[in-house]
Amino acid sequence: IIKFPRLTVGATENSIIAACLAKGKTILKNCAIEPEIKDLTKFLNSAGAKISWIGRTCKINGVKTLNPTEYSVMADRIEAGTFCVAATLAKGNLKISNFDAKIIKTELQLLKRFGAKIKAHKEKIFIKGPQKIRSIKNIKTKEYPGVATDLQSQLMVLMCKASGKSSITEN
């Protein structure tokens, strides 16, 4: 049993990978649960790993070998979020296809507060940037499913163009 003292993406990913081929059962507690970690789990399971999740606890039963597999890696949520911020900033229109909007739900709600019009339908996101970008006070980055730290700089650019004062705090 390994209990992480704080949420950490890199340590969670590396521990999962290492535990796949370790003898016996490994239990990881207080894991980061970013979508990329869940996607890594799906990939490893498709190669023969035995990984399961309950909340922030990951259970891995070690296997002797992993098998070759074909797998489509998920779309990059930070890249998609960056395009969404850019459309809001440019007051333009954007359509993103083949992307699960649920994984950036928090950021899309935030962009709505800035004034963007957003529709998410199945695997598509439609964004129309506002004519006037509203300010937002007290945005706080947080581990997933909170506002992604990796989108903080893009959001700061958007805040510079907003009417009024805005603030963001790194968690």
Where are these regions (language model features)?
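Short, structured segments at the rim of ligand-binding sites
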Residues: I1-N171
